Amino acid sequence: MKAHGVKLKGETYICLLNALAATGRTDQVYAIVRDMTAAGLGLNKFCYAGLITAFKNKTPASEDTPAKILEFVQQSKGWRYVERVANDSAENIMMNVSDEELYNLPTAEFAHRRGFIFKQLTIYHVAIHACADLGSKETLEALLDMFTKENFNYDAFIVMQAVRCYLRCGDIDSAVKMFEEFSSSKPTPAELYVTLAEGAMIGYTPRGMEVAQATLEKMTERKFFLNPKMGTDLLLAASGEKTGGYTTANYIWDMLQTRNIIPAFPAVEAYYKGLKEREIPSDDPRLVNVARVLDNLQIRLGPRRNFQ
């Protein structure tokens, strides 16, 4: 487009920047930034979000990524539009396409969920999501400190990603504390319960499995239900437990059965194999039921595998 003398709008640059950020090519992302500057365009929060994403996805991983994340969050505080792309934005709104979806941000799937995300927190959404992906607890806590100093309030997405980060780093207590502080004062979406339960199962420690079980029981008490994706993810995670009574996996299976929800084949297969590894009679009702569900799924998918 540049070769043909077409002047790109700010929104087009930002789309390109975020698309390249997904590949981790920081050199190409910086090239877009230089082109924007040359065109008289300033960087807005979506540009800084793209820069954070680019460094998060960079391969091989860079040692300065945590510092870069903090740097971009700080720089974003002075963002402004030099050219406001009002017409494009209006068109996107009419088409019901949010900025989060347009720029493929981590919050895209929640953009139309009332009260799930506070849109003024975009840069923190992306930065804390990056911390969770990278498993960088130190960077997370630096961001949360910056967040608190700006007198912002957490939204569900911020808490969900912070909980995920803590759990990936093995800090179950901090994850539980953050979850409980948020849930005690605000409506808590099912996704947050699922994030805590699934993450607590990492490593299958006694403490983690206890937290996962308690979290699922709270979901049931509050009349939350698992959808097929949530159920599949949780069952797949719980089915990896090699010791213990398989209590959590059984509980998740029962939650799904109550709603007549059949999880995806890999989760059912993993659950079945976990049951078979335990000393369960071949005519046990649970084992028979799971085997039947597995057979039915296999018929839909193709040639039968050997599950015995």
Give, region by region, the residue ranges found by the protein language model.
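A basic, Ser/Thr-enriched alpha-helical scaffold prevalent
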Residues: 1-308
